[in-house]
From Swiss-Prot:
One of its GO terms (cellular component) is glycine cleavage complex. SUPFAM superfamilies: PLP-dependent transferases. Disulfide bonds: none annotated. The glycine cleavage system is composed of four proteins: P, T, L and H. This is Glycine dehydrogenase (decarboxylating).
Length: 955
């Protein structure tokens, strides 16, 4: 290619779109840092012993249009049959007002988990609506704000039964009519936590001594029957009962809470979220009041702010992994907030009457087909059903299944039966085509409808029909026109801070650009419309995509094989530690159960180790934030015979490249252990070093950090794991398609949240080797620039041997608090007045702020943040000098709202302008928190996790 063609080409255009600082700005930043070139900065930052000797072998980057064209060709390899497979996954109509204004809206998908409630009231309200929806439809007293998928929710429920129950048994019962993918994940969890699992017909539950039981309602084969007596009988033996249920079925069926269930779990997928070949989807869990403090996952609660006004927040956080570490109720970190919001908006938009109409239509179509099949001489497995029929087809099974495929229809195949599940997208013409497969040509559906309609709910036993009301709160009975719904969505969106407003400098979270070109394919029907258990030849596009992405990730990480199954980073950690333990077991070393974890580690690390029955041994860090090599050597020697592994993060959670990391790996390997390298900080490795090159054996990657899947306000995420070849046989398997074996599944679907894989594929394809490496260098440049600008004003806790940091830095507020009385929380809240999300508070060191600007923020935004932090330091000085009292200053009173600005009274020693417009930039583009500082203690002492009365919403 000629030099001119290269100059005019667009293949590298995306790189400068993704990276914030223009190349012309680099020199100014380097001058501030004290480096002559970017390469000099990298050499002073990344230890030479771990720098890659040659570039990654990846294709050159593509332009946005070229990438989209190539990805469209891949997507078109998928075959979109009409799916009647069911099994927890259903086609659905995503209301366009939700599709455009939530799923495709960066105001919703680029927000972070709502740890800062003052700037998160919109999505907190949406998640509270989700909890209310789940509570109403299940008939239980409290619900969480989503889990990863139905199968992992069932596994979490199993452990909740053990924590919350009084039975001394170590056995968990699973009914034989539970979805097989759910059973597979439960078996994995049970094996490594030390439980036994019994699978039997639910009628035999009473003959077993078990601490918990999982039933399905309706069953996987479609049967509807009252479980009340069965549950009551189980309770007499101190058995807690979990029921996996269906939200749409619960509109017409007696809710499981009214039957006595202790816990309900399931998927909210069919409430407007595409199947997406398995995800992402929001799972749900609801429980009795008595189990609330043991329930896993985020829970949204109602509290008050400093002015006594209602404010929402994440409640009961002290039970979560980032607080309790190895004693946490779960390792859950990322959940499925964006998808939970979509499901809650689906319920808000349709309301109870709309949902009843949808449920009635689905059931009516099922009854029509049941009538037609029985009239034609087919026998049904069950006479009572909601949306699923199991047809006894005996010797005709293969013939009918193949005939259906020829008509572009997917049925669920059993040995001598066929399953048919209906959904809201089913039409009358679909029924005609389907019945023709069974030899019923030109079916008179209108005649059948009239006949079935004489007793519309004959297929639902009287005692299983719902009589209780649901979704009575005004929020579910108001926004039914598109105009109303649009304004409600926009009202909530406007309450929240996202990347559309400014930088989110959260350390360890990598809130980088989620480019529109990366996001576009997520809503393509070729990716969204495939059932995860469709025949593999119909998912050829997904197979191509997964193979390509795994190859890219292997090259980037230095690993030999990848599994894309884990639905989050925490799930990836879990799968990785299982691979290690299975490897030890295969070598006769099943006794190796000690996991070494540095004191700086993220809370998921010890929580995950506990989930696989490991003994956590903490390794000290030295005064520079590095692993204490003397303490490490002592711990290895002490536990050598039982050493399983070490979990490290690189660069360390303290934000520095530890120069002795290879020595750490060698020491653990010499003692027979494996090295788990947490991929949370991969954004500082790509193209410069890699986990495999460093010497680790297994890592998870947070695709929602380094590889551009958006955080979604608390999910979705993906945590695929890469391994060296010796661990490859121990990657997660799956029951439905046999890829990599059939055991040790960690997610309901083999490719986990498959429909968001195109985001990471697109990012890598557009950046190429040069762009990815450049992004890492710019992330390091940005972080060091911020550090050097702040260092004269704030102590920086840890730096490398040359005074550099990796991609994030820790600002130590403790000495400033001693001098001024102002805390890290005060600074975090005051940043909201300047138009910023707070950095990470008190992690990994209490009393600190951790800042990660990422490569996507430009120089002007970095300066705006630094100027805000410097201005806040000057405000702290005024408190220190007595100009402002400690109990009445703009920091302790932050954040300030529009109501504060308009208030008739003002009893503060600073002006309204100082309060609300502390910088010139805040005047130009002001973001307003909608509540004052939220009272966390009040919220936990007065726990309310349901929608408040409408009066509380009036403004």
């Amino acid at each position: 290619m000629s030099q001119l063609l290269q100059q005019l080409g667009t293949d590298n255009e995306f790189i400068r779109r993704h990276n914030g600082p223009a190349s012309s700005e680099h020199q100014h930043m380097l001058n501030t840092i004290g480096a002559e070139t970017l390469q000099q900065l990298i050499e002073e930052t990344v230890p030479s012993s771990i720098r890659l000797p040659q570039p990654m072998q990846l294709p050159h980057g593509l332009s946005e249009n070229a990438m989209l064209a190539e990805l469209k060709q891949i997507a078109q390899q998928n075959t979109l049959n009409t799916s009647y497979i069911g099994q927890g996954y259903y086609n659905t109509h995503t209301p366009n007002v939700i599709l455009r204004n939530v799923l495709e809206n960066p105001g919703w998908y680029t927000a972070y988990t709502p740890y800062q409630p003052e700037i998160s009231q919109g999505r907190l309200e949406a998640l509270l609506n989700y909890q209310q929806m789940v509570m109403d439809l299940t008939g239980l007293e409290i619900a969480n704000a989503s889990l990863l998928d139905e199968a992992t929710a069932a596994a979490e429920a199993m452990t909740l039964c053990k924590r919350g129950g009084k039975s001394k048994s170590n056995i968990f019962f699973v009914a034989d009519d539970v979805h097989p993918q759910t059973l597979a994940v439960i078996k994995t969890r049970a094996k490594f936590i030390g439980f036994d699992v019994i699978v039997d017909n639910e009628s035999n539950l009473d003959s077993h001594d078990v601490f918990g039981a999982l039933l399905q309602y309706p069953g996987t084969t479609g049967e509807v029957k009252d479980l009340t007596d069965l549950i009551a009988q189980a309770h007499t033996k101190k058995t807690l009962v979990v029921v996996a249920t269906d939200l749409l079925a619960s509109v017409l069926l007696k809710p499981v809470g009214e039957m006595g269930a202790d816990i309900a779990i399931g998927s909210a997928q069919r409430f407007g979220v595409p199947m997406g070949y398995g995800g992402p989807h929001a799972a749900f869990m609801a429980t009795r009041e008595k189990l609330k403090r043991s329930m896993p996952g985020r829970v949204i609660g109602v509290s008050i702010d400093s002015k006594g006004n209602q404010a929402l927040r994440m409640a009961m956080q002290t039970r979560e992994q980032h607080i309790r570490r190895e004693k946490a109720t779960s390792n859950i970190c990322t959940a499925q907030a964006l998808l939970a919001n979509m499901a809650s908006f689906y319920a808000v938009y349709h309301g109870p009457e709309g949902l009843k109409t949808i449920a009635r239509r689905v059931h009516h179509f099922t009854a029509i087909v049941a009538k037609a099949l029985q009239t034609a001489g087919f026998e049904l497995e069950h006479q009572h059903f909601f949306d699923t029929l199991t047809v006894k087809t005996e010797q005709q099974t293969d013939i009918l299944y193949t005939k259906a495929l020829a008509s572009s229809i997917n049925l669920r195949k059993f040995d001598t039966k066929l399953g048919i599940s209906f959904d809201e997208t089913t039409t009358v013409s679909d029924l005609v085509t389907l019945l023709a497969v069974f030899g019923i040509d030109n079916a008179e559906c209108e005649t059948l409808s009239a006949e079935v309609g004489k007793d519309e709910f004959a297929a639902i036993p009287k005692h299983c029909q719902r009589t209780s009301s649901f979704l009575t709160h005004p929020v579910f009975n108001t926004y039914h026109s598109e105009t109303q719904m649009l304004r409600y969505l926009k009202k909530l969106e406007n309450k929240d801070f996202s990347l559309t407003h400014g930088m989110i400098p959260l350390g360890s979270c990598t809130m980088k650009l989620n480019a529109v070109a990366e996001m576009l394919p997520v809503t393509w029907p070729e990716f969204g419309g495939i059932h995860p258990f469709a025949p593999l030849n119909q998912a050829a596009g997904y197979t191509t995509l997964a193979t390509s992405l795994k190859s890219m990730l292997c090259e980037i990480t230095g690993y030999d094989e990848f599994s894309l199954q884990p639905n989050s980073g925490a799930s990836g950690e879990y799968a990785g530690l299982i691979a290690i333990q299975r490897y030890h077991e295969s070598r006769g070393d099943a006794h190796r159960n000690v996991c070494l974890i540095p004191s700086s580690a993220h809370g998921t690390n010890p929580a995950t180790a506990s989930m696989v029955s490991m003994k956590v041994v903490v390794v000290k860090c030295d005064e520079n934030g590095n692993i204490d090599m003397i303490d490490l050597a002592e711990k290895i020697e002490k536990h050598q015979e039982n050493l399983s592994s070490i979990m490290i993060t690189y660069p360390s959670t303290h934000g520095v490249y530890e120069e002795q990391v290879r020595e750490v790996c060698d020491m653990v390997h010499a003692a027979g252990g494996q090295v788990y390298l947490d991929g949370a900080n991969m954004n500082a490795q790509v193209g410069l070093t890699s986990p495999g090159f460093i010497g680790s054996d297994v890592s998870h990657l947070n695709l929602h950090k380094t590889f551009c899947i958006p955080h979604g306000g608390g999910g979705p995420g993906m945590g695929p794991i890469g391994v060296k070849s010796h661990l490859a046989p121990f990657l997660p398997g799956h029951t439905e398609n046999g890829v990599q074996g059939t055991d040790y599944a960690v997610s309901a679907a083999d490719l986990g949240s498959a429909s968001i894989l195109p985001i990471s594929w697109a990012y890598i394809a557009m950046m190429g080797e040069m762009g990815l490496t450049e992004a890492t260098k710019v992330a390091i440049l940005n972080a060091n620039y911020v550090m050097e600008r702040l260092r004269p004003h704030y102590p920086v806790l840890y730096r490398g041997s040359n005074g550099r940091i990796a991609h994030e830095c820790i600002i130590d507020i403790r000495p400033l608090k001693e001098a001024t009385g102002i805390s890290e929380e005060d600074i975090a809240k005051r940043l909201m007045d300047f138009g910023f999300h707070a950095p990470t508070m008190s992690f990994p060191v209490a009393g600190t702020l951790m800042v990660e600007p990422t490569e996507s923020e430009d120089l002007a935004e970095l300066d705006r943040f630094c100027d805000a932090m410097i201005a806040i330091r000057e405000e702290m000085h005024k408190v220190e000098q007595g100009e402002w009292p400690l109990d009445n200053n703009p920091l302790v009173n932050a954040p300030h709202t529009q109501v504060d600005l308009m208030s008739d009274s003002w009893d503060h020693p600073y002006t309204r302008e100082v309060a609300c417009f502390p910088s010139s930039q805040s005047k130009d583009s002001k973001y307003w928190p909608t509540v004052n500082r939220v009272d966390n203690v009040y919220g936990d002492r007065n726990l309310i996790c349901s929608c408040p009365s409408i009066e509380n919403y009036e403004e």
